[in-house]
Amino acid sequence: MYKTKIICFLLGILSGLVFAPTFFIPALFTFSYLCYIVQKSQNWQAAAKFGYLFGFGHFLSGMYWISIGVSVYIADFWWAIPFALFGLPIILAFFISTNCTLSFFAKNNKYYQLIFCLLWVLFEWIRSWICTGLPWNLIGYAFSFSEILIQPLSITGIYGLSFIVIYIATSAYPVFSKNFTKLKILLASSMLILTVMVIYGAMRVSTNPTHFTDIKVRLVQPSIPQTAKWDEEEFWHNLMLHINLSEKLEPTDLIIWSEAALVVPDDIPQVKLELLNMLNSTNAILITGGISDNKKHGDKFELYSAMYALDKNNHKLFEYHKSHLVPFGEYMPLKKILPFKKLTHGLIDYKEGNGGLVYIKKYHLKIKPLICYESIFPNFVQTNNEIADVIINITNDSWYGKSSGPYQHFHISRSRAVENGLPMIRVANNGISAIVDPVGRIVKKLNLNEINYIQGLIPQKLTTPTIFSQFGNFAMLLPIVFILLIHYLLSLIFDD
């Protein structure tokens, strides 16, 4: 049993490599071993331990980069690094452990593997909302290396794709028990499912070439180190770097800066002057991340992480406040119990906004705004493309250095475009900035650590709404029913 525990932990670490940037797809079949060892466990306690150790390794290798973010201000938060590196995997591993525990009680069921897969997706969904939610590295994102294989997102959403992926990933589990009849059923059904996915994905991509609006957009990526971003001595250098990257000879309609690009109010006279000079020289509208407040004092004062638009006449065209805040980063949960300050700059916690759409009248452009972390929540982003034209996602991934975090964040965000049939304009201070079309094609992009800008046109949205955008998570029932039907029919063929 000791040896099995070590194997589960090591395979869990290997399984974390299925996500960006490695996309080591052979590691998907580590889940087959987990599925097998749970079924063969002597009791539910053993199944729970095997699942927990696998889960701990899985989240340790997949989300280690969070500790890098904590280490940015190491003098103040050195004590939090072990909690970020090990504490989060320790907690998240319980989701996989519980899945394995419940699956154990179905070990003699003819459809054990299907039950394991259904429970896997159930706990991914629970993970997306419990304690504010963290739907990061859902197993469906393992297929985001391929624009063809992610097309089912338009129908099923990420949870439906997760069910497909975990079904395929566990299809080899009978090889360990030498149950070759079951193996034939699962491998045949997996191959059939993959074939359908490839055909559907290829058809959807080929029949939806990228078409563009006439709205010109400039994405600015200054790649300012996190330690310099809030440094008063670096403020003017940082602002002028943004402006220099924005003021180019090519005409543009929109200039987009990243999350918290403006770390001071835009109405400070000298800041306002520089911004208006830039907007007059480019004849553009600026969409930027910044800090906003409710203009009140004392106990009524509230601070927001904002996205807003300014024109050359100093009119604020819209202001959006971030709705999904990062626990411990932008606010301290249980503040009366935990006597710590948040990780980001300042002593005051940010307040939640109300979500929704924003509008730029000049271009008749209806925008679904997303600030950073908000893009990982599929239900929050779910938007019918009959009421929105584009997703604009601003972020700051400079916290996480050259780790896997910025790559994972990009591919998670990109999935929202496919789900909703909307183009995405993604602008990172540092990370991956890109123009993405409504089927997930990367039209143009800047890589991690590049200091540059992208000039391009906003892609057109799809002409019809996606199934997911209309029905949300209910649409995940479609692949479940489809796979159950295939599994049943192949069982009739191969079973003795």
Curated annotation (Swiss-Prot):
NCBIfam families: lnt. Catalyzes the phospholipid dependent N-acylation of the N-terminal cysteine of apolipoprotein, the last step in lipoprotein maturation. CDD domains: ALP_N-acyl_transferase. The keyword Iron does not apply. Belongs to the CN hydrolase family. Apolipoprotein N-acyltransferase subfamily. One of its GO terms (molecular function) is N-acyltransferase activity. Residues 220-464 form the CN hydrolase domain. This is Apolipoprotein N-acyltransferase. Pfam families: CN_hydrolase, LNT_N. The active site is at E259 (proton acceptor), K322, C372 (nucleophile). It comes from Rickettsia typhi (strain ATCC VR-144 / Wilmington). Its EC number is 2.3.1.269. Gene3D superfamilies: Carbon-nitrogen hydrolase. It comes from the Bacteria. InterPro entries: Apolipo_AcylTrfase, C-N_Hydrolase, C-N_Hydrolase_sf, LNT_N. Keywords: Acyltransferase, Cell inner membrane, Cell membrane, Membrane, Transferase, Transmembrane, Transmembrane helix. The chain crosses the membrane at residues 6-26, 50-70, 77-97, 114-134, 148-168, 183-203, 474-494. GO terms for biological process: lipoprotein biosynthetic process. The keyword Zinc does not apply. The lineage of its organism: Bacteria, Pseudomonadati, Pseudomonadota, Alphaproteobacteria, Rickettsiales.
